[in-house]
Structures are given as structure tokens and as C-alpha cells.
Amino acid sequence: MFVCSLCKVQCVCFEKLASSIENQSDTSSSLRRIQRFISLYSLDKDLIARLIFALLPNDPPYSIAIDRTNWKFGESNINILVLAIVYQGVSFPILFKLMPKRGNSHTSERIEIMERYIKLFGRETLEYLVADREFVGEEWMQYLNFNRIEYHIRIRDNFWIRNPKNDKQFKV
């Protein structure tokens, strides 16, 4: 009920969530229940991912995007690796990994989030992966190729590409 209210209200304001819950209780009672729930319960991230996946209006396979966001909150660095399903130009974050450091993700972190997606939803639900230019590297590309994951990755203008058919290199 709580997660459905989050989707309905599209915010995390407890008062708005409480007023959106359709039941016989008073809004203040719903608010206290939400506060108790948040303070006592640890949400299962995989369960939330499955719920979001089930609520998507279209059937798989899906395009997925991987991205990273980094900002400072006071003295704390917040760095999150996100895997999202892209549907009609909108990205729905489905999996994330908090990274205890600043800067780009490592290949192992990317593989971990991809493996989690495949474990939860299956490889067949993935049409292709979209990523920005920070998501490159030989080991990462080998992982994607080995697992037959089609990808569209922006690359830097100073990159050299090797054509596997004739082994010739050319600058992008």
C-alpha cells in the first residue's frame, strides 16, 4: 500500500502519502503508521525493483540505461550507480548501488548491478543497454560481449576503434 501511494502521489512527503491512502482511517492515523513503518522496516530493494518492473505498462524486452550521479550533502559525498528501464523516453530507476567513494564506477560495480538485473528479471527482458562515455573499458566491453548484451555507449572523440573484421583501427 505504501509503495503504491508513492507511485500515486509521486513524492515522499509523508503528509501527502497519508492523505492518498484509501482506507477507513483518519489521515493522521495513516501518517503515524507511515512514520512507524519507515522507522521500523527495512525495505527490500529487490522487492521494490520487482514491483516497479511489474507496474511498467509495456511488455519486455526493455532498453535499459546505466548512469551515475554524484553530489555533496554537507561533508558527505553521495555517489549512486543507477540502472533504469527506459520507456517512451522516461527512465524508471529500478536498481541502484550506493558507492562509498567519489568518481567513476569500477567495472566490478557495473557487472554487479547488471548481474542483479539479470538474476531478478532474466537476460531475455533486456533489449539493449545505453550508457554515457564513462562506462567504457576493456573488461566491461568483454563482459557485455560475452553475455551478448547489445550496447549503445557514447564515446570520447579521441577514441580509436578496431574493426574486428579486418583488424584496422580508425579514430572516432
Stretches with model-predicted labels:
Residues 27-29, 54, 59-121:
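RNase H-like nuclease fold core
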